[in-house]
Regions:
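Activation segment signature within eukaryotic-like protein kinase domains
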Residues: 148-149
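Short beta-strand micro-motifs within the conserved protein kinase catalytic domain, predominantly
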Residues: 99-113
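Conserved catalytic-loop aspartate of Hanks-type protein kinases
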Residues: 222
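Catalytic-loop of the protein kinase fold
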Residues: 160-176
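Conserved activation segment of eukaryotic-like protein kinases, specifically the C-terminal portion
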Residues: 198-212
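Conserved short submotifs of the Hanks-type protein kinase catalytic core
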Residues: 111-126
Length: 277
């Protein structure tokens, strides 16, 4: 979706916002940087809006027919599922969980698609900080890892106390403010712990523990994934078993590294870590 189309879409709900650029995108939607201008002070502020497009295929209609469900009811159930996931995030009260400023769902009249719009603070993903920190000293890398650990562990504490697993902890889902604070975001695939949906089909296997292969995992999966993120921060932004920086990484290297980790090979010490850490 281009910026002009996006502007037309959100003007129905948030006429004070103007989409300025695309911040990033992936499987679960596109994030747009937006601006709003205070009518009294004329001060311009930044916000972000994530747009998730949910497409409905002929197979969806066939599945609804097989189950004896009117497609309109099926469509509304999918809509409610997405909105409930956002409500979970809104209900999680932590200074280190991305704050939701508003959300809505916009339906296509023919039920061919559904747009979920989430309005939030404009932040920078941790993986976008890589160029500025790739050549950090061990002391600088340790300081960054410690700050990320403290902030995101606080966010996970609140999640797990409320029975919510994030299930996709990775640098792209850890966000940084201009003041250097970190926030946990992108709960688009979070589930209540009782639901235990497949992590391998939703999360990022690069940061997942071995237990996801059997589906036998709990809140500790989030902690493990965060641990791998922290490992990379003190290993020149590379995961375990990959070639040492600055040697180029091939797809084969990544496959071998993942195989070693999933088979329980002890992790080598990170190469940019202080002795104290």
């Amino acid at each position: 979706m281009d910026t002009n189309t996006f502007n037309n879409l959100i003007s129905q709900t948030w006429p004070d916002l103007h989409a300025a650029s695309t911040l990033g995108g992936g499987t679960f939607g596109t994030v747009y940087a937006c601006t709003k201008t205070d009518a009294v002070t004329s001060v311009t502020q930044k916000e972000a809006v994530k747009v998730v497009r949910v497409d409905f295929t002929p197979e969806d209609r066939a599945n609804a027919d097989e189950e004896g469900i009117p497609f309109a009811d099926y469509y509304r159930a999918v809509k409610e599922k997405h909105l409930q996931e956002i409500r979970w995030m809104v209900a999680l009260k932590s200074p280190h969980i991305v704050h939701i400023n508003g959300y809505t769902a916009i339906e296509e009249p023919d039920h061919s698609a559904l747009y979920i719009l989430i309005r939030m603070d404009c932040l920078t993903a941790l993986d976008q900080l890589r160029p500025a920190h790739l050549n950090d000293t061990p002391e600088q890398a340790a300081a960054l890892a410690e700050k990320v650990a403290l902030d995101i562990c606080d966010a996970l504490r609140v999640c797990h106390q409320n029975g919510v697993l994030h299930r996709d902890i990775k640098p792209a889902n850890i966000l940084c403010s201009d003041t250097g604070d970190f926030y946990l975001g992108d709960f688009g695939i979070s589930k209540g712990t009782a639901q235990q949906a497949s992590m391998t089909s939703s999360g990022t296997l690069e940061y997942a523990p071995r237990e996801v292969m059997t589906g036998q995992y709990d809140h500790r999966a989030d902690l493990y994934s965060l641990g791998l993120v922290l490992y990379a921060l003190v290993n020149h932004w590379r995961g375990p078993f990959l070639p040492a920086y600055p040697v180029p990484i091939t797809p084969g290297d990544r496959n071998q590294a993942q195989y070693a980790r999933m088979n329980g090979t002890p992790l080598p010490p990170p190469d940019n870590c202080t002795t104290a850490l």
